Amino acid sequence: MIQFKRETCSDLEGALRREWLETNGLGGFASSTIIGLNTRRYHGLLVAATKPPLGRLVLLSKLEETLFIDGKGFDLSANRYPGVVHPLGFRYLKKFRLAPFPVFTYEAEGIEIEKSVFMIHGENSTAILYVLKKEDNRRESPKNVGLEIRPLIAFRDYHGTTHENDAINPEVQERSGLASVTPYEGLPSLHSAHNAIELRKTGNWYRNFEYDAERKRGLDFSEDLFSPFMLRFDLRFCRQASIIASTEPRGVAQAVEYRRAEITRRRKTLVACPTEDSFIQSLAAASAQYIVSRGDDKTVIAGYHWFGDWGRDTMIALPGLTLPTGKYEIARSILRTFAKHVNQGMLPNRFPDAGGTPEYNTVDAALWFFEAARSYLAYTGDLEFVRDELYPVFVDIISWQVCGTRYGIKVDDSGLLASGELGVQLTWMDAKVGDWVVTPRRGKPVEIQALWYSALCIMEDLAGRFADEVAQKRYHHMAAVAQRSFNRLFWNEDLGCLHDVVNGGPPDASIRSNQIFAVSLPHSMLPQDRARRVVEKVEEHLLTPFGLRSLAPSDAQYHGCYTGGPAERDGAYHQGTVWPWLLGPFISAYIKVNGGSEQAKRQAQAWLSPLESHLADAGLGHVSEIFEGDAPHRPCGCVAQAWSVAEILRAYFEDVRGLRPKPRASSPNQSKNCWPDFSRSLRPEPVHQRHTALRSKDRTRHSNNSCLDP
């Protein structure tokens, strides 16, 4: 359990860098700092997903809370205004803990109250419960203990801010135990169920809130919030005050039952976690917060607070988020979700927040799709699902890659996968500022080739399972050609590692973390001696306590700090910034080249230790998106990132613990940390030497196209 006592809560700077997160399984969330002072425009008690998992609106920003003891008021809130923090409610915060959701314990003049905040799973609803816990027996018992609460509403897109305006409708619709507001036409209503003894309409604007995290990011950081009413509770009479803020009308009587149900639901996650390691159990609990609904199926939120569901992130995160803990139905649903959206051999890069057509500017999401499906099949043996719903899509993807699809993505005469157009970012190193693509990587990026080869090996295996001998031979041949070309073109003997990009001219010899995938993936193109040298080079130049740097510090383009406005930060995003998710493939590769030895596993476990301490910093219970490249490696970006959590879980269970799914007898090509056999007689023939023109007007399905003829 993560817990902070008074000394931490009263340290303003330390308290503000620790943020809690509640989610609802729809893409909505509630979040703030441990003292309730909002530092981001994304903070709020109800950030509703109006078009799950997107369309997120900050409806209820926060509550202004005042505890009254015999008429004397104690403000429990905290806000930052220009030049001042007011009030200073954290002075009364005795303790904060995650148990399993945020619980705040306040104490004033011997009176102790406990506040719990949690979201109701599957609803855009947040419950806030206050309980009178203790009265100091050393003093005369107070005659009156009350609580006044003023909701502060924003009603805006979660990427923006709002300001005082005349368009707001201040009306409050009242009925017994329910207060409803609809401040703007076209936006949802906010319904506040409560057990207050009094509701008083106020209609006040609170001006000039400042969000310091946004100021540091060079973004709009000032906002005005509206308070439509005040609620007064008598804690001496019922000892409990309850509010349920929701987009749907509901009663408050079930608040305690909702709390009990949420605790039970979350405990089931830990029961399914096959370890007693508290660090891994915490990550397993966190993993559930990234899995959300998209229609009738499931998807993955890439990161909180501002990411939606991205194809690449989802496929990378899927194995770690779902498979070691037995969430096979969810994994299958996620695979089905994205199979529906494959278009011209590509998976969506992202779904826009406002809805509409997905964006397809990614070369690797479709390739990670193969790897996610391979993992799913290895854990479940669900061959029927793969055969009926995924295999036809995979055949189509390979065909499009060979014949050519958007953005210059096409297999060239080397049998490797080339990609790239001017002004378009296609790999995971996708930062773009205006027309400036920071790391364009046009040509043949190293990890794309590793994924391409792995996809071909997976297809060879599947074709064999499905008794498609012709296809099996075809994929075997394509993989062999790619393997030969890769070793010829990508090995940098001078540095003893792999080039990052090959593109006709001088190869890009930057020492980047991308090369680790040529070792970590189950199907590797490298002989063991080269694989070992790659791992050693990555360890020497890129390994930090929190993950791998994206670029070696010795490089002239290296950025060790991640600060400033959007242009400055995007310029550093993949130019030295540390990515925790890369620790997963690094651990896989390290244990692999060391033959799965116990010593290697102990070393890998040691590399995970700093991240355990990190769970009590930044996004509590989660792993941040990135860290600065220079020590002490300040956490940055999203405070909770799906693939950061997922890859640590996957590497821990599969590599450190060795709990890999056992290869099935019917899968002759299932890798067992083995290395490619270079003794096979392979002809380095161009894989698509016999291209023919596409005749079909509808290019969304051409799995039998002659581009794939061997």
Where are these regions (language model features)?
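Inter-helical turn/loop segments and adjacent helix faces that build the functional surface
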Residues: 137-139, 143, 376-389, 458-475, ...
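A short, charged helix-loop
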Residues: 422-440
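Terminal accessory carbohydrate-recognition/targeting modules of carbohydrate-active enzymes
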Residues: 1-273, 305, 312, 327, ...
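Aromatic-rich carbohydrate-recognition surfaces in CAZymes
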Residues: 162-167, 174, 183, 235-237, ...
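Solvent-exposed loop and edge beta-strand segments that line ligand/cofactor-binding
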Residues: 115, 223-232, 297-314, 353-366, ...
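Catalytic cores of carbohydrate-active enzymes
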Residues: 274, 281, 349, 402, ...
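Non-catalytic C-terminal accessory modules of carbohydrate-active enzymes
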Residues: 74-101, 108-110, 489, 536-563, ...
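An acidic-aromatic substrate-binding cleft motif
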Residues: 253-299
